[in-house]
Amino acid sequence: GALSNGALTLGDASYKFNDGHFSGTVNAANFNTTSDATLKTNVETLTGSLDAVKSLRGVSFDWLENGNSEVGVIAQEVEAVLPDVVSTNAEGIKSVKYGNMVAVLIEAMKEQQLRIEALELKLGE
C-alpha cells in the first residue's frame, strides 16, 4: 500500500512478488538479487564467455511506445547466444536479465586478462 512518505509497498515479508511489468522508469537505491550458495545446486564456472560477449551487440534505440532514447541490447540477439538470460512473457515479449549478464561479463573479462598476460609474457621474452 501507499505510505505517508509517498512510497509504495507490495505485501509484507511473507508475500513474494514473483512477476511484474513496469512501463517507464523504476528508481531505487539498490536492487538486490538473491545469490546465496545454500540455495543453489549444480554450480559450474561459465566457459566461452568471451566469445559470447564478442558476438553481442550494444545498440542505441528509441522505444516505440514513448519515443524515449535508450541504449541496451536486443533480446532476440542475446537469446541466440545466452538463452538463460532472456525471459519470454505470455504475450511473447522478451526481456533481458541484465543483472545475470554480469556473471558472463566477469568470466569474459577473466578470459581476456589471461590473454593479455600471455601476450605480455611473449613481449617480455
What kind of feature is each model-predicted range?
Residues 1-98, 115-125:
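C-terminal intramolecular chaperone/autoprocessing and neck/assembly modules of extracellular spikes
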